[in-house]
Amino acid sequence: MSVEPPPELEEKAASEPEAGAMPEKRAGAQAAGSTWLQGFGPPSVYHAAIVIFLEFFAWGLLTTPMLTVLHETFSQHTFLMNGLIQGVKGLLSFLSAPLIGALSDVWGRKPFLLGTVFFTCFPIPLMRISPCRVWWRAPVVPATCGRRMA
């Protein structure tokens, strides 16, 4: 004597995820029988290319005024110092991106995004109001760490 469940319960059980299973919540994930949940469609290389372009464009906007300050400070070695700064930026980005990414997975993305944006923007007015020329170094580290979050 076997008792079969009604067909409505079978369909409901088949559509629900197993206990403990996490439904996909990332951008571009598609739920069964629905349209795209978030974002502009499935992830593609073009989305990454836009983000990379914006990062280098923003860094270029900061490099132009920084060259003026570098020329005033190191008149004989302006481009050498710019290359050194760019190299340190790349190294710090390489080291900080996985660390900040892992921490943001644990504590959430919003606090890290807000923090990196704040620490990226905070030193720029200080460069303008400071009587000494030490502040030109300040945007390098936060900009390096902050730009890799996006």
Swiss-Prot record:
Protein name in the entry: Major facilitator superfamily domain-containing 14C pseudogene
Annotated signal peptide: none
Major subcellular site: membrane
PROSITE patterns, per the entry: MFS, SUGAR_TRANSPORT_1
Family stated for the protein in its record: Belongs to the major facilitator superfamily.
Disulfide bonds: none
Annotated compartments: Membrane
Entry superkingdom: Eukaryota
Residue ranges crossing the lipid bilayer per the database entry: 50-70, 83-103, 112-132
Keywords linked to the UniProt accession: Membrane, Transmembrane, Transmembrane helix, Transport
